[in-house]
Every structure is written in C-alpha cells, then in structure tokens.
Amino acid sequence: AYTPGSWGYIGGEIFRRSPGRIGTTAEVKDTRNVPLLQTKRKDIKAYRFDLPDGDYEVELLFADLNARSERVTYDLGAVATLDNADFRGSVFNVSVNGRPWLSHFSPAIEVGGNRCISKKLRIAVTGGNLTVDFEAVKGMTFLNGIKIFRIH
C-alpha cells in the first residue's frame, strides 16, 4: 500500500485464480517475466510514487489471467475455478499525473488472454510525485507490473 514519502498501490485487492491461491499457474506468453505476470492487483485505483522532479519513463505490464489455460503437469491438485467476477473483457482508462494516457484500454482485446502487453510513456514529473490512475469503463481495472525509470 502507498506510504507518504515512498510508493505503493492505492485500492484494489490481490487476484486469486482459485480460493487460497495467489495468482495463477497458467503460462503467460510474450514475456520473460512469467512469475511477475502470473499475479496482478485487481480493481486498483492508483499507483503513486513520491520521487524527485525530473523526466521518467513509465512502463505498465498487463495480462488478462482469466482466459482458459492449459493444465500444468506439476500442478495436478489445483482446482481451476474462479472466485469473484470474470474480468476478461475489462475495459479501463489510465492517466498519469492527471493526463489521459490509455483510453478504453483492454489487454484481452489487444492481445488475448494469458499474454503480456506492455505500455510505455515518458513524462516530466513536477511536484515530487508520479501518480498512475485507473478508471473502470467495463469490468474491473487491473495491473500486473509497473516499472519506473529516471531518464538523465
């Protein structure tokens, strides 16, 4: 969670593919960071970083984890059920420091299920913080990973 003077998420909850299990064992394609993309924060409101003013690159990583996936041989005891709502087909808006960035964005529509899609943006930070806001249009917002790089 966000802590003033530091960084963190605001709102949302951990994605659980089946009761008692964080994330999914499904293979996520189009990434070398499979373990990272097998988890996500769902219904996230924002991610905030308190950092020095300057130029930064923001990279957001998404993967819709609710598509049917192949059964994993080493995970024979897993129960392949979903709790809560089906998030496939979620559509949401993303803004950075109040500036609209991704409008009516849907990872499932762009690349399909269990596939990574990355979105990058360069931004000048003033006022000591960088905030990425998420707004649901249909379904829920979600985020699998975030990277922030300072550009010198």
Model regions and ranges:
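Compositionally biased, intrinsically disordered or flexible polar/acidic segments
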Residues: 1-152
